[in-house]
Amino acid sequence: MEFEKALSILKNLCSENVVEHCLAVSEYAYELALAIKNKGYEVDVELVRLGGLLHDIGRSRTHGIEHGVVGAEILRELGFDEKLALIAERHIGAGITKEEAIELGLPPKDYLPITLEEKIVAHADNLIFGTKRVEIDDVIKKFEKRLGKNHPSIKRIILLNDEINNLLK
């Protein structure tokens, strides 16, 4: 599916601020994917670009924690590739464990990013507040304020940040 068609669908479903955020995440994720590919790693840069664009399509129906799961459902309903649906489903923070999903009222399974493409989009999303790129310290502060200093998702965010940065060395 080409970028412009996906962007048109996103614009039809989501508010302007969500679209602008998705464009910023897509651009940053694409830059990261190209840089990682240039280091010799196997990465589907177009999947990352589209995944970044569509990761928050679930916000057309909800802004709750379930927007990743809802987004994956929307993408499947619209006939998008399963790889894109999984990017949406697994992009929140650095993922959600099955145990956390149960506590949050999500369908009971792991929502942790597995593929490199999923990880790049989740990481890029973490580092974009609205349309602005921020540092990892800002991300950690935001999640600590929201979830508490010792929440396991914060450690996962730091590990994901380290993993992506190591690929760029």
Curated annotation (Swiss-Prot):
- SUPFAM superfamilies, from UniProt? HD-domain/PDEase-like
Superkingdom is: Archaea
| Domain called HD: residue spans | 18-130
* Record-linked PANTHER family: HDIG DOMAIN PROTEIN (PTHR38659:SF2), METAL-DEPENDENT PHOSPHOHYDROLASE (PTHR38659)
Under what name is this protein listed? Uncharacterized protein MJ0778
